[in-house]
Amino acid sequence: SADQPNSIPPRERKAGCKNFYWKGLTSC
């Protein structure tokens, strides 16, 4: 969830879904 950046780093949130975060998409 993009609402918990403090709990899980955006780049460590999901190895395969880290790209979605940088792009700004929440399709993961």
Swiss-Prot record:
Gene Ontology MF terms in the entry: hormone activity
Lineage top rank: taxon: Eukaryota
Disulfide bonds listed in the record: C17-C28
GO CC aspect terms: extracellular region
Presence of keyword Disulfide bond: yes
Major location category of this protein: secreted
InterPro entries (alphabetical): Somatostatin/Cortistatin_C
Subcellular location: Secreted
Protein's UniProt keywords contain Metal-binding: no
Keywords linked to the UniProt accession: Cleavage on pair of basic residues, Disulfide bond, Hormone, Secreted
Protein's job: Somatostatin inhibits the release of somatotropin.
UniProt record similarity statement: Belongs to the somatostatin family.
Protein name: Somatostatin-2
Organism: Oreochromis niloticus
Lineage: Eukaryota, Metazoa, Chordata, Craniata, Vertebrata
Gene name tied to this protein: sst2
